[in-house]
UniProtKB/Swiss-Prot annotation:
Transmembrane segments: none annotated. It comes from Linum usitatissimum (Flax). This is Disease resistance protein L6. Changing residue 201 to R: Abolished ability to promote cell death and impaired homooligomerization. The record marks 131 as: Important for ADPR cyclization. It catalyses: NAD(+) + H2O = ADP-D-ribose + nicotinamide + H(+); NADP(+) + H2O = ADP-D-ribose 2'-phosphate + nicotinamide + H(+); NAD(+) = 2'cADPR + nicotinamide + H(+).
Amino acid sequence: MSYLREVATAVALLLPFILLNKFWRPNSKDSIVNDDDDSTSEVDAISDSTNPSGSFPSVEYEVFLSFRGPDTREQFTDFLYQSLRRYKIHTFRDDDELLKGKEIGPNLLRAIDQSKIYVPIISSGYADSKWCLMELAEIVRRQEEDPRRIILPIFYMVDPSDVRHQTGCYKKAFRKHANKFDGQTIQNWKDALKKVGDLKGWHIGKNDKQGAIADKVSADIWSHISKENLILETDELVGIDDHITAVLEKLSLDSENVTMVGLYGMGGIGKTTTAKAVYNKISSCFDCCCFIDNIRETQEKDGVVVLQKKLVSEILRIDSGSVGFNNDSGGRKTIKERVSRFKILVVLDDVDEKFKFEDMLGSPKDFISQSRFIITSRSMRVLGTLNENQCKLYEVGSMSKPRSLELFSKHAFKKNTPPSYYETLANDVVDTTAGLPLTLKVIGSLLFKQEIAVWEDTLEQLRRTLNLDEVYDRLKISYDALNPEAKEIFLDIACFFIGQNKEEPYYMWTDCNFYPASNIIFLIQRCMIQVGDDDEFKMHDQLRDMGREIVRREDVLPWKRSRIWSAEEGIDLLLNKKGSSKVKAISIPWGVKYEFKSECFLNLSELRYLHAREAMLTGDFNNLLPNLKWLELPFYKHGEDDPPLTNYTMKNLIIVILEHSHITADDWGGWRHMMKMAERLKVVRLASNYSLYGRRVRLSDCWRFPKSIEVLSMTAIEMDEVDIGELKKLKTLVLKFCPIQKISGGTFGMLKGLRELCLEFNWGTNLREVVADIGQLSSLKVLKTTGAKEVEINEFPLGLKELSTSSRIPNLSQLLDLEVLKVYDCKDGFDMPPASPSEDESSVWWKVSKLKSLQLEKTRINVNVVDDASSGGHLPRYLLPTSLTYLKIYQCTEPTWLPGIENLENLTSLEVNDIFQTLGGDLDGLQGLRSLEILRIRKVNGLARIKGLKDLLCSSTCKLRKFYITECPDLIELLPCELGGQTVVVPSMAELTIRDCPRLEVGPMIRSLPKFPMLKKLDLAVANITKEEDLDAIGSLEELVSLELELDDTSSGIERIVSSSKLQKLTTLVVKVPSLREIEGLEELKSLQDLYLEGCTSLGRLPLEKLKELDIGGCPDLTELVQTVVAVPSLRGLTIRDCPRLEVGPMIQSLPKFPMLNELTLSMVNITKEDELEVLGSLEELDSLELTLDDTCSSIERISFLSKLQKLTTLIVEVPSLREIEGLAELKSLRILYLEGCTSLERLWPDQQQLGSLKNLNVLDIQGCKSLSVDHLSALKTTLPPRARITWPDQPYR
């Protein structure tokens, strides 16, 4: 009991610190403002220390700008803010007009509290503003409370000495304040100014180039925050100074050569920590930096392309989804052309023998001099293969004895040294740990606050492991010291729940009496698990491997172990009925689409967790699986003709998850009976796969769930009746896309503990009655009733944070915590709250001050027009809350204009879709949206002009990144004229789409394209372009990656397109121009990978020299592909479809000239001879092949070239005349085989015994192959791997 009391005490003491277990590093430089001479210089804000510090809880902003608007808003502050945005640094910019009342508002306080770096711009009038002084005092206070925060002042045309001593203009300001504020307040303000004046910062004089200084400030700020993800705990830094010094020496930072350093050592020795510390120390010396962790796991799971995209996105500061390549060769090309030109630092953490530097990054010689690469691995042999690239090796060895003792003491005693009476024991323990940091931390945490006897027992166990080479047995000592319940939780996480949210496992563990609340904290204290920001479980890979090894060592036979996480072992256990009472948990993570009969579960009396994707259960389950707690069968399918599931009486079930399922059998395949019998259920998630099967699953009669349920979620399930009468414990109720005839047993108002209720797109006869008293639910935070037309709510719960509804909201002004509001298809419309001219507390929007997102869809907006001289007969100025960051208005019939949007200075995204149906007018107000980043306007009838767009684009603070305008038939003007003047540049614009606006005068916008120098994606489907030179402006877009150009018949003068040599980054080109005859200069586009030509009915020839992917379709007059035989050796993807005049025979015969081709599609082309296809057998790199022919190719009866395509993974053949396919059995890599529509096919393999050779086959579709014999089909069932999903000519195979 004393041990438990100590644990409880430790929990109470450590819980606040556990919850803040990530730390962030501040700058450590001294002030550059010299106290002696009062001079200043620009700061070199680069941390050269590895001293740790923590991360901030709930950080929202990276930078907080404090300034006096009249002094700097239109000058330096805008320069700086725009520069910070270009660096994608999330910045809070304060304005005087945001401040109201006598104190700093809660929103501003929250912004200060949730920022990491403060940048006060101290100007001559800064102290004149009480708001600025209040802000500065609060900033200083927060920084003093938390030294991790950084203050980087900017002295704007003022003397820092005046700031420090409050002389000059500041003395006058404080004289004025002295008459209005008490002495203590004045002193606090002076102290804040003095502290900031003492700090180093930037000094801006009259003749300084403010834009250049703003960029310098941004770059230095970025050097701070770019290290944020390299978090190092205090204890991680113990003992690594020698490692850092050694690695820095090998990196030879003064050398002009590209240098690689490989760190190797056993798991848990500190390789990653050393790499992070070196990264933190030197990253500021490089143009760009990137740290990629978990290489081994990521490459095995997702492939090298994911790693390449992460590298490119980190270095270029772009979204990984827009990097412009989808295969490893494209990644290497992008890295060579766009990344290698920077001086970069790249850390590749935890590589194994599968990693090849050249496969991911290309040759090190491609990178600019002084670039550096750090690679970590457990194996010296793996790094030894890099020696040809002059990789310098360094072994990260064990910690020294003094450092080991220090690290151990931090965990065992919460101090740097042991107490005198524990000193001998502590030294003895350290001697047994071999200087392994992970072991020292785990064992130290184990012994924290333990009695001497426990220390002595642990020491004896450690001494028994002295001769072991691996960390397993040392770490296992900490595992052995856990209580039995904590052991079960630890092994469950290691085997099944890493990366998963903790909520549902808690239910299972609670029912098993594992006490998860206390034991999870206990495991965190012991450094054995972590819980992430999203409540997901995390675990060091060494501890994960140890946990799984513990399970493996339980028995040499998998079916005699407690947990099975291998699909192969799980399938073998069930199909061969090898179950035993030792098995507690089984997971079959990937789909097997197989039937498991009840006898497969014999002897599994202790099984408590079963997860099997696409499996089906049949038979009599009476007295089977009595202890099952968790049953999860995603993509479960049970039809009317399938064997039934009977006597499913698992009374101890806690969690049932049947998502993406399709159950059509009577009594729902036995599941309804199970629901009745499972009296202890806590979580039920049922969802039919409506998108796949096109219809909902039906639950007949009245369904009653056990009264124990706390989470009930049903999606796309049709029900006669649901009884909620006894579900008093519900916390979450989701009934989405569920037609319900009746909800019985009471009303939702009686569910007092309900936190989330979703009734989206539901309808039923009494839905209105059961929601009538929902306003009583004080605990409800999320309510979604959109599409539920029968729902009418007179009063919404006051504590809501998120509301989606199709009902009127009579008490909107009382929803003070509301952050997200969506109104969809409300028949009564949405009553736009009137705003008072003074915007005082009588305004509804002023009260709902936390609202961030407003979506009005398919709803009439009810407004009152103010008819007076000041309003001009329009709506009040402040009609929408200024807190909004996202506004979407879709198919809202009124009003016929958007009032008040010019005031939405925080708005980042505006979507307008189909709302101007009755308007013959304009959209105005864009000029005021200074934070706007995304603008989408689609299908807006009656919209003639977009006013304010030019003013927005010409603003020096313009942040617009993406602009889409489509399907606006009445639009005649975007810009009244092209953007002129040398100073007008919109560097933020990255994507521009203009489509289907037939009356639009697009010329001014096209001629303005050079003003968008960073434009990466351009999509133009426009009319009325009559001159080829009108398109010349596109050629100036040097950053362009993707270009789509579609012109109609009104642009008949466009017969030739000349590709500019400046488009060196263009990877994708899509052209749809009927009048086009020729494209010149394609050979100049060195990065072009994908070329799509569709509807170019006049096109006659193509020069294709550097192409990676060619897709040609719908070009009936195309007859020739020039130079294809010798000029496209780099081609990787080729698609030809619907080109009847193209001589495809010569093209096919030239395919051997494309040695890198890995994807080939020939669809609806004219092939008349079988021997024309033989050449395909020479394409040894081919990964995917699709051959689709129609009845005109009736001579193709046999395919015999496949046996040489050993890398082929996907084969799609649709040839009606085909009778035989040779060589399929030799395709060892084949995973997907589609033969749909091969109506004459008689057999797949000459020898049925060869079927078993396709070990990797996952999908076989032979639907439509009506000529296959019964014997052939029977052989398929018995010889193909169990995982293979087969679609038969008439029905799916189980």
